[in-house]
Amino acid sequence: GAVRDIKLPPGALQKLADVEPRLVGQTFDLPPVDPGLNSRVAGVLTGSMDDYGLAVLDLSNPAAPRYAEHRADHKQNVGSVGKLVVALALFQALADLHPQDIEARRKLLKTTLVTADTFSQTDHHTVRMFDPASRTLTRRAVRIGDQATLYEWLDWMLSPSSNSVAGMVMREAMLLRHFGAAYPVPEAQIQQFFNSTP
């Protein structure tokens, strides 16, 4: 049976082999602002337009890229970029533990069950939680006690950009780095580690 949810666009369903990076080996200077594209971008940002700095590079025609910007000089700390660093830290810890064994890395991601604790608090971003028994899909913020695989925590951090989930993934990267081959460790050992680590 199918679960009711938002249907993914066709491009999101393509396999990696179908992705063709068309700009490999090409270089170009950033084109001047395209007035038509700029006004279309401005139309999307109505209401909260001045809360954002935005740049759009339209590569639908690689021979003639188009550029639009809004508040180009606006400086802002983008939290989602930090989540990429958290993901990189976790993947590097996995690679250091299993340098030649990608399947061992995948196994840890698939089988490690992570339980939310105070590292997960608090956030307004919701995550998708699927209950296989009732076949229901809900969206809500993470709560202490929620359980999911490490793969799911990564997905929740990157897809809806959940800050609280990023805290949990940071926790797991630290635990993986500290405990190495003994990872994953029981909850009591996790609490003891963080209670005794300055």
Question: What is the meaning of each model-derived region?
Answer:
Residues 49-51, 73-75, 79-81, 154, ...:
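Extracellular structured ligand-interaction cores
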Residues 77-105, 114:
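Active-site SXXK
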Residues 6-74, 97:
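Beta-lactamase-like hydrolase cores
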Residues 57-60, 90-99, 171-179:
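Short regulatory "switch" loops immediately downstream of catalytic or recognition motifs
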Residues 19-41, 102-198:
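Active-site-adjacent helix/loop patches that line small-molecule binding or acyl-intermediate pockets
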Residues 57-59, 81, 117-119:
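Acidic/polar N-terminal loop/beta-strand segments that form early-domain functional surfaces
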